[in-house]
Amino acid sequence: MPCQDTVSLSIQHTHVIIQNSCCTTVSTSASTSATAYGLGCLALGCAGIAAAGICICCLIHGCPACPRRLGVRKQSSLSKQGHVSFHHLNPSDRVSRPYHPSCPTDVDLYLGGVQHDPDYVSHAQPIETQPQPLPPPPAYS
């Protein structure tokens, strides 16, 4: 038999089950072989599937290397309908919430604003009390 460029794989798995003093053997085996030509076709197929997946991902989610406006032509029909303007929000357009002393902001917490909270300060101050004597140990009879 002449030597060929063949890759083969054989797997055998034997599982012995002992149940109620009865030995049952389950054996499975699988084997496959492929020539170099088959491996080349398999590699090309995997590469094609990977390339198609990357293209679909770029089309759906956008690719950082690709421009975002692939489907928009510079001279499109939008210029006939009207002017489209892109503006950025001004600082006055931002939503602001009123400051409430019982709800410190993140900046206040970062700068130590919680230490200026009256509840925090009252608990942090030392409590002056007199030491209490320990009770006598229990009497054993």
Curated annotation (Swiss-Prot):
Transmembrane helix keyword on record: yes
Domain of life of the native organism: Viruses
Locations listed in the record: Host membrane
Membrane topology summary: Single-pass membrane protein
Membrane spanning stretches: 40-60
Keyword Transmembrane belongs to the record: yes
Principal place of residence: host cell
Keywords: Host membrane, Membrane, Transmembrane, Transmembrane helix
GO cellular component annotations of the record: host cell membrane; membrane
Family: Belongs to the aquareoviridae NS5 protein family.
Listed name of the protein: Non-structural protein 5
